[in-house]
Amino acid sequence: MARTKDPAVRSLLLDRAAQLVGARQPVTLRTLVAGTGVSTMAVYTYFGGMDGVWKALRQEGFVRLAAKLAAVKTSTDPVRDLAALGSAYASNAVENPDLYRVMFDAGFALEDPGAADETLHRLVRAVERAKTAGRFRDDVDPLELATQSWTIGHGLASLVATGPLPHQALAHGVPVLTALFTGAGDDPDRCRRSVERGWGRADPAGSAPRDGRDAPR
């Protein structure tokens, strides 16, 4: 009778692999299981080999990102929500810097590419809501603006999570996103307030306006 796989062992090995990446140490069968209490056979049991480890590690990065974005509550202010998604993206990178190093390494395929695509589609839907609400011009391409917004979050996150800048540098997201969204047609003052509400909160999941009472007008 086949033994049931223990999800905790899989998570343990993924965390170990991420730690090795963060420490810039080689990720091999032996280094992966060292100090974990499991054998090298577990790598084959749970991942089919080292290539499977890298695929799963990339996927885990997007799984955690998706969970972070899903925790951002939808408010009556779509521009605030768009900024909050960017803030959640940056926060995820800072909280999981080792996984963040691996997420965008296209040397190994993702187990579920659709899950990665969904993270961008959340931003696209927020842009579409902003257009419907009259915040952005009708000629704005949702995918294009969402990608530009993602690029800003990705750049700041990379410089803070794995680069030379301090955490405080994330505050630059407010003026940069404000400039981007104003260029898409939003009113400058209203846009600034929306972005500050979305990007400036430490916990984007808890920052949704209640009943629209603090949505900018």
Region locations from a protein language model:
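All-alpha amphipathic helical-bundle segments outside canonical DNA-binding/catalytic cores
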Residues: 80-83, 114-118, 132-148, 168-171
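Helix-turn-helix
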Residues: 12, 20-52, 56
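Hydrophobic alpha-helical connector segments
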Residues: 70-99, 120, 149
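Amphipathic alpha-helical linker/stalk segments
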Residues: 59-82, 114-118, 129
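C-terminal peripheral helix-coil segments that are non-catalytic and often amphipathic
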Residues: 121, 125-133, 165-217
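Short secondary-structure transition hinges
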Residues: 91-132, 158, 167
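Generic hydrophobic, amphipathic alpha-helix propensity
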Residues: 8-17, 32, 57-61, 65, ...
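Alpha-helical DNA-contacting segments of helix-turn-helix folds
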Residues: 21, 53-61, 103, 119
